[in-house]
From Swiss-Prot:
Protein name: Uncharacterized protein Mb2296
Family annotation (Pfam families): DUF202
TM region(s), chain numbering: 18-38, 48-68
InterPro entries per record: DUF202
Organism: Mycobacterium bovis (strain ATCC BAA-935 / AF2122/97)
Length: 109
């Protein structure tokens, strides 16, 4: 297959691949939140122990909303001039880093 036929067959799939990637990330964050909730309800540390699970749920929700926005942006033709989600990626990366720190701190208690 040459480059032109690959590009022609790939037309429109960028939005689906992007949505799948963001959705997988959201699902991983959601599973993290569920596992933290199960661990913390078993340990009965009180409501403060559920903070990491809440953060994971919030990060998963944000990630899913970003996935929907990205799919909508990439489905427009012609593509918008700026299609990189820099601000969204920074927000989500910060949320994941905060989640990691809070989870690590909660595990130490």
């Amino acid at each position: 297959m040459n480059r032109h036929s690959t590009a022609a067959s790939d037309r429109g799939l960028q939005a689906e691949r992007t949505t799948l990637a963001w959705t997988r990330t959201a699902f991983a964050l959601l599973v993290n939140g569920v596992l933290l909730t199960l661990k913390d309800t078993q340990g009965a540390d009180g409501p403060a122990g559920l903070i990491p699970a809440g953060l994971a749920g919030a990060a998963a929700s944000c990630c899913y909303v970003i996935a929907l926005q990205r799919q909508r942006a990439l489905s427009h033709r012609p593509l918008p001039a700026r299609i990189t989600p820099r601000g969204q990626v920074h927000i989500l990366a910060t949320a994941v880093l905060v989640l990691m720190v809070v989870t690590a701190f909660a595990q130490l208690l």
